[in-house]
């Protein structure tokens, strides 16, 4: 597949279009056909490099992903192949005490797509099924890609933390 990668930290001249292996998914993972990936400030920081933080190279940037599920390996997910999704870019273990109370970002194993893990500046992105959020056709992929960080933050607070249920306001 084609992807925009960096081989070292630096300016925009370090962004390179390259052929890279298509990700292979395991149980409870999905392969998302990336339709749009917004530029997030985190992508710039990652490209430029941050003192004390090592990023695996070569690296695919892009944390704000919108796309369509191309392949999914899950027996319990309601999301199926062809579903339009945005991706919650923060990946946690799901089993530690912080994850159990909804504080995923405090997980010792917390990673972000496009930062510690390969992201969405590619034709496909490998994503945990639990990080997929199905979205409507009301907006374009480009519009959805512009809002994962804000959308996911608001969704997390309403659904996970406040436990808002259908019909409640």
Question: How would you describe each model-predicted region?
Answer:
Residues 3, 34, 154:
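Terminal peptide-recognition signature
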Residues 7-11, 37-39:
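Short polar catalytic/cofactor-binding loops
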Residues 12-21:
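Short glycine/threonine/proline-enriched tight-turn/helix- or strand-capping micro-motif at secondary-structure
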Residues 21-38, 50-100, 136-139:
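Glycine-rich beta-strand-centered segment in the early N-terminal region that forms part
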Residues 1, 83, 167-169:
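Nucleotide donor/acceptor-binding cores
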Residues 91-169:
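NAD(P)H dinucleotide-binding glycine-rich loop of Rossmann-like/cofactor-binding domains
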Residues 41-47:
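Cytochrome P450 core scaffold surrounding the K-helix E-X-X-R motif
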């Amino acid at each position: 597949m084609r992807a925009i990668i960096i081989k070292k930290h630096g300016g925009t001249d370090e962004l390179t279009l390259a052929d890279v292996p298509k990700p292979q998914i395991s149980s409870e993972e999905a392969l998302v056909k990336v339709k749009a990936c917004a530029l997030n400030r985190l992508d710039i920081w990652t490209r430029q490099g941050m003192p004390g933080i090592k990023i695996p190279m070569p690296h695919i940037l892009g944390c704000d992903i919108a796309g369509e599920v191309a392949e999914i390996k899950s027996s319990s997910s309601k999301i199926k192949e062809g579903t339009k999704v945005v991706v919650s870019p923060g990946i946690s273990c799901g089993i530690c005490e912080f994850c159990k109370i909804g504080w995923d970002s405090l997980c010792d194993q917390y990673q972000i797509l496009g930062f510690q893990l390969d992201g969405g500046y590619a034709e496909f992105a490998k994503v945990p099924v639990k990080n997929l959020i199905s979205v409507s056709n009301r907006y374009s992929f480009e519009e959805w890609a512009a809002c994962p960080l804000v959308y996911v933050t608001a969704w997390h607070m309403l659904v996970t933390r406040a436990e808002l249920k259908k019909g409640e306001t």
